[in-house]
Every structure is written in C-alpha cells, then in structure tokens.
Amino acid sequence: MASSRSSEPQARVRPIETADAGEVLTLQRAAFVSEALIYGGADMPPLTQTLEGLEAELVENLGCVAEVGERIVAAARARLDGELLLIGRIAVAPDMQGSGLGSLILHAVEERGREAGAREAELFTGRLSEANLRLYTREGYRETERAGGEKGEDQIFLRKSLVP
C-alpha cells in the first residue's frame, strides 16, 4: 500500500513483526511525548512499556507499520476479541504528523481486521487529545463510552463498523 497524497513522502505499509519491536518502541516513545505534555506526566503505558513487553504484544498482532525508505514512521497495533478489532498505540513520528500517516495506518489496520473477520473496530484516547479525536471522528469513529477519572471522562472509547 502506498500513500496517495502528493505532498507527503511515499509510505509503504506492511504487517507489524516482532522484529520491529525496537524501532516501534522508539517511535512510540517519541510520538507519545506530546501526550505526556498534555496530561502533565510521563507515567503512561506507551512511555513505560518495555521492549520485552512490546515483543510479547507483537506475537500474532494484526497491527501495521508504515515505512519511508528504511525508517518506520507510523505504527499501530490491533488484536481480535471475537468480531471486535481492538486498535491501540497508533503512533506517527513527530516530524511526520499531519501528513496523512495516521489515516493511512488506521485504514491498513482496519483492513487487516476485516480480513481476519472483524465486524467492528474500537479504540480509545484521552479526553484532552484533540488531534486524536479529530482524526478518529474524521475516519468514521463515534464515541461509545467514557471511563476513568473522577468524572468518568479521562478516556474516550470510540467505535466504527467495518462492514457495509
């Protein structure tokens, strides 16, 4: 798969592999620093995850990575829970954010989920993560639940149908 925007570098999307763990962890940490600044602390799973934990997570994962040249510039993980595709840790390199890679990687993961039998996709983000919420809404996701925090609104869960 290649990106279609002419203003962005051509990205090649492929399934995520266990061998990608080191580079994906580096990308994830770089991408989630902005989230840590929004929420006032770095004690969040994308920033504290270990290499060993990520390697274990990538076994039989439906996620994808996007590469420009030899560099992984975007990644997302996903797994099936029945017919529900659970998508997580969407990360785009800070210098590539806003170039369409978030949509590209999200579409690729959704397609892998469809091929594996998913009928619906779910993801979540923090309530203060406005750019994430804009992306997910633009891509057809709708809020289904708020959870966590004193007022139950720290995390926003969103879903999208994957079938016509």
What is the predicted function of each stretch?
Residues V65, R71-R79, L86-A91:
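Conserved beta-strand in the GNAT
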Residues G113-T125:
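Conserved GNAT acetyl-CoA-binding A-motif
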Residues T26-L54:
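Conserved GNAT-fold acetyl-CoA-binding loop/helix
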Residues V65, I90-Q97, T125-R127:
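A short, internal acetyl-CoA/4′-phosphopantetheine-binding micro-motif in the GNAT/acyltransferase core
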Residues V92, G98-E111, R134-R138:
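Conserved acetyl-CoA-binding loop-helix of GNAT-fold acetyltransferases
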Residues L123-L133, G149-D154:
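Conserved beta-strand-loop-alpha-helix junction that forms the acyl-donor binding cleft
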Residues G53-V65, L86:
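A short helix-loop-beta-strand connector motif used in the catalytic cores of GNAT acetyltransferases and
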Residues A11-T26:
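A short beta-loop-alpha structural element at the N-terminal edge
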